[in-house]
Protein backbone atom coordinates (compact mmCIF):
# COMPACT_ATOMS: atom_id res chain seq x y z
CA UNK A 1 0.00 0.00 0.00
CA UNK A 2 2.78 2.45 0.92
CA UNK A 3 4.61 1.84 -2.36
CA UNK A 4 1.48 2.40 -4.44
CA UNK A 5 0.73 5.63 -2.58
CA UNK A 6 4.34 6.74 -2.97
CA UNK A 7 4.19 6.18 -6.74
CA UNK A 8 0.92 8.10 -6.98
CA UNK A 9 2.36 10.87 -4.79
CA UNK A 10 5.43 11.09 -7.05
CA UNK A 11 3.20 11.39 -10.12
CA UNK A 12 1.15 14.11 -8.41
CA UNK A 13 4.32 15.86 -7.29
CA UNK A 14 5.56 15.80 -10.88
CA UNK A 15 2.84 18.27 -11.86
CA UNK A 16 4.70 21.57 -12.10
CA UNK A 17 2.10 24.20 -11.36
CA UNK A 18 4.53 26.98 -12.32
CA UNK A 19 5.04 25.51 -15.79
CA UNK A 20 1.38 24.59 -16.28
CA UNK A 21 0.13 27.99 -15.14
CA UNK A 22 2.65 29.81 -17.33
CA UNK A 23 1.34 27.82 -20.32
CA UNK A 24 -2.33 28.33 -19.43
CA UNK A 25 -1.94 32.08 -18.91
CA UNK A 26 0.56 32.66 -21.72
CA UNK A 27 3.38 33.99 -19.57
CA UNK A 28 7.08 33.22 -19.70
CA UNK A 29 8.17 29.70 -18.82
CA UNK A 30 9.74 30.11 -15.36
CA UNK A 31 12.43 27.58 -16.28
CA UNK A 32 13.65 29.98 -18.99
CA UNK A 33 13.20 33.25 -17.08
CA UNK A 34 14.24 34.84 -13.81
CA UNK A 35 16.13 32.35 -11.68
CA UNK A 36 15.09 29.45 -13.92
CA UNK A 37 13.36 27.73 -11.01
CA UNK A 38 9.78 26.50 -11.56
CA UNK A 39 8.46 27.58 -8.18
CA UNK A 40 6.36 30.27 -6.54
CA UNK A 41 9.22 32.71 -5.88
CA UNK A 42 10.31 32.76 -9.50
CA UNK A 43 6.69 32.94 -10.65
CA UNK A 44 6.40 36.12 -8.58
CA UNK A 45 9.37 37.51 -10.50
CA UNK A 46 8.28 36.49 -13.99
CA UNK A 47 4.46 36.34 -13.87
CA UNK A 48 3.24 38.40 -10.91
CA UNK A 49 1.43 37.85 -7.63
CA UNK A 50 -1.66 36.07 -8.92
CA UNK A 51 0.22 33.25 -10.63
CA UNK A 52 2.75 33.08 -7.81
CA UNK A 53 -0.06 32.54 -5.29
CA UNK A 54 -1.71 29.92 -7.50
CA UNK A 55 1.65 28.17 -7.90
CA UNK A 56 2.20 28.25 -4.16
CA UNK A 57 -1.25 26.81 -3.46
CA UNK A 58 -0.81 24.07 -6.05
CA UNK A 59 2.64 23.13 -4.76
CA UNK A 60 1.49 23.09 -1.13
CA UNK A 61 -1.57 21.05 -2.10
CA UNK A 62 0.41 18.37 -3.88
CA UNK A 63 2.48 17.87 -0.72
CA UNK A 64 -0.54 17.90 1.58
CA UNK A 65 -2.92 15.62 -0.33
CA UNK A 66 -0.79 12.43 -0.31
CA UNK A 67 -0.20 12.74 3.44
CA UNK A 68 -3.92 13.16 4.10
CA UNK A 69 -4.76 10.17 1.89
CA UNK A 70 -2.15 8.07 3.70
CA UNK A 71 -3.66 9.08 7.04
CA UNK A 72 -7.18 8.34 5.80
CA UNK A 73 -5.99 4.86 4.80
CA UNK A 74 -4.70 4.29 8.33
CA UNK A 75 -0.96 4.48 7.74
CA UNK A 76 1.37 5.57 10.53
CA UNK A 77 3.12 8.92 10.69
CA UNK A 78 6.40 7.57 9.30
CA UNK A 79 4.63 6.07 6.29
CA UNK A 80 2.69 9.30 5.81
CA UNK A 81 5.98 11.19 5.78
CA UNK A 82 7.61 8.87 3.23
CA UNK A 83 4.56 9.18 0.98
CA UNK A 84 4.81 12.97 1.31
CA UNK A 85 8.49 12.86 0.42
CA UNK A 86 7.59 11.00 -2.76
CA UNK A 87 5.49 14.04 -3.74
CA UNK A 88 8.42 16.35 -2.97
CA UNK A 89 10.75 14.17 -5.07
CA UNK A 90 8.20 14.46 -7.86
CA UNK A 91 8.44 18.24 -7.56
CA UNK A 92 12.25 18.13 -7.54
CA UNK A 93 12.53 15.67 -10.43
CA UNK A 94 9.21 15.75 -12.33
CA UNK A 95 8.54 12.92 -14.74
CA UNK A 96 6.45 15.15 -17.01
CA UNK A 97 9.03 17.95 -17.34
CA UNK A 98 12.28 16.13 -18.12
CA UNK A 99 13.11 15.76 -14.41
CA UNK A 100 13.79 19.51 -14.19
CA UNK A 101 11.89 20.71 -11.15
CA UNK A 102 11.87 23.22 -8.36
CA UNK A 103 13.44 23.46 -4.93
CA UNK A 104 10.62 21.64 -3.11
CA UNK A 105 10.02 24.11 -0.29
CA UNK A 106 6.30 24.72 -0.86
CA UNK A 107 5.59 21.04 -1.50
CA UNK A 108 7.53 20.17 1.66
CA UNK A 109 5.45 22.75 3.55
CA UNK A 110 2.29 21.02 2.36
CA UNK A 111 3.64 17.67 3.46
CA UNK A 112 4.55 19.10 6.84
CA UNK A 113 1.13 20.74 7.14
CA UNK A 114 -0.40 17.29 6.86
CA UNK A 115 2.03 15.71 9.30
CA UNK A 116 2.15 18.29 12.07
CA UNK A 117 0.68 21.80 11.48
CA UNK A 118 2.55 23.53 14.35
CA UNK A 119 5.82 22.71 12.56
CA UNK A 120 4.57 24.63 9.52
CA UNK A 121 3.78 27.62 11.73
CA UNK A 122 7.32 27.52 13.13
CA UNK A 123 8.82 27.19 9.65
CA UNK A 124 6.63 29.98 8.25
CA UNK A 125 7.57 32.32 11.10
CA UNK A 126 11.27 31.55 10.61
CA UNK A 127 10.96 31.96 6.84
CA UNK A 128 9.16 35.31 7.15
CA UNK A 129 11.61 36.68 9.71
CA UNK A 130 14.65 35.57 7.72
CA UNK A 131 13.17 36.94 4.51
CA UNK A 132 12.29 40.26 6.17
CA UNK A 133 15.87 40.62 7.40
CA UNK A 134 17.68 39.33 4.31
CA UNK A 135 15.20 39.81 1.40
CA UNK A 136 16.50 36.45 0.16
CA UNK A 137 14.04 33.60 -0.41
CA UNK A 138 16.67 30.86 -0.62
CA UNK A 139 18.27 31.85 2.68
CA UNK A 140 14.84 31.96 4.33
CA UNK A 141 14.11 28.43 3.07
CA UNK A 142 17.49 27.12 4.22
CA UNK A 143 16.93 28.55 7.70
CA UNK A 144 13.28 27.51 8.08
CA UNK A 145 13.43 23.89 6.93
CA UNK A 146 15.89 22.47 9.49
CA UNK A 147 14.23 24.38 12.34
CA UNK A 148 11.31 21.96 12.15
CA UNK A 149 13.47 18.99 13.10
CA UNK A 150 13.73 19.56 16.89
CA UNK A 151 9.97 20.14 17.12
CA UNK A 152 9.28 16.96 15.17
CA UNK A 153 11.76 15.00 17.30
CA UNK A 154 9.78 16.08 20.34
CA UNK A 155 6.19 15.86 19.03
CA UNK A 156 6.25 13.50 16.02
CA UNK A 157 9.35 11.32 16.35
CA UNK A 158 8.12 8.97 13.63
CA UNK A 159 8.45 11.80 11.11
CA UNK A 160 11.98 12.76 12.16
CA UNK A 161 13.96 10.45 9.86
CA UNK A 162 11.90 11.25 6.75
CA UNK A 163 12.03 14.98 7.53
CA UNK A 164 15.80 14.80 8.03
CA UNK A 165 16.09 13.20 4.59
CA UNK A 166 13.79 15.88 3.21
CA UNK A 167 15.90 18.64 4.75
CA UNK A 168 18.95 17.14 3.06
CA UNK A 169 17.15 17.08 -0.30
CA UNK A 170 16.13 20.72 0.04
CA UNK A 171 19.64 21.81 1.00
CA UNK A 172 20.99 19.81 -1.96
CA UNK A 173 18.57 21.53 -4.35
CA UNK A 174 19.73 24.90 -2.96
CA UNK A 175 23.44 24.17 -3.45
CA UNK A 176 23.80 26.76 -6.26
CA UNK A 177 22.01 29.29 -4.04
CA UNK A 178 24.45 28.48 -1.23
CA UNK A 179 27.40 29.14 -3.55
CA UNK A 180 25.82 32.43 -4.61
CA UNK A 181 25.08 33.39 -1.01
CA UNK A 182 28.68 32.82 0.02
CA UNK A 183 29.93 34.71 -3.06
CA UNK A 184 27.51 37.61 -2.47
CA UNK A 185 25.68 37.04 -5.77
CA UNK A 186 22.34 35.64 -4.55
CA UNK A 187 19.20 37.40 -5.81
CA UNK A 188 17.35 39.65 -3.37
CA UNK A 189 13.85 41.09 -3.50
Swiss-Prot record:
GO terms for biological process: phospholipid biosynthetic process. Keywords: Cell inner membrane, Cell membrane, Lipid biosynthesis, Lipid metabolism, Membrane, Phospholipid biosynthesis, Phospholipid metabolism, Transferase, Transmembrane, Transmembrane helix. Pathway: Lipid metabolism; phospholipid metabolism. One of its GO terms (cellular component) is plasma membrane. Its main location: membrane. Catalyzes the transfer of an acyl group from acyl-phosphate (acyl-PO(4)) to glycerol-3-phosphate (G3P) to form lysophosphatidic acid (LPA). This enzyme utilizes acyl-phosphate as fatty acyl donor, but not acyl-CoA or acyl-ACP. This is Glycerol-3-phosphate acyltransferase. It comes from Pseudomonas aeruginosa (strain ATCC 15692 / DSM 22644 / CIP 104116 / JCM 14847 / LMG 12228 / 1C / PRS 101 / PAO1).
Amino acid sequence: MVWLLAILAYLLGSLSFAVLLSRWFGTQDPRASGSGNPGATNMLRVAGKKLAILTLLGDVGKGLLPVLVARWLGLGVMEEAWVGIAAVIGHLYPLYFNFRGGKGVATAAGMLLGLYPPAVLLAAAAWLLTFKLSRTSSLASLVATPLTLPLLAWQQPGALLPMTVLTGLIVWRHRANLRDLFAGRERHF
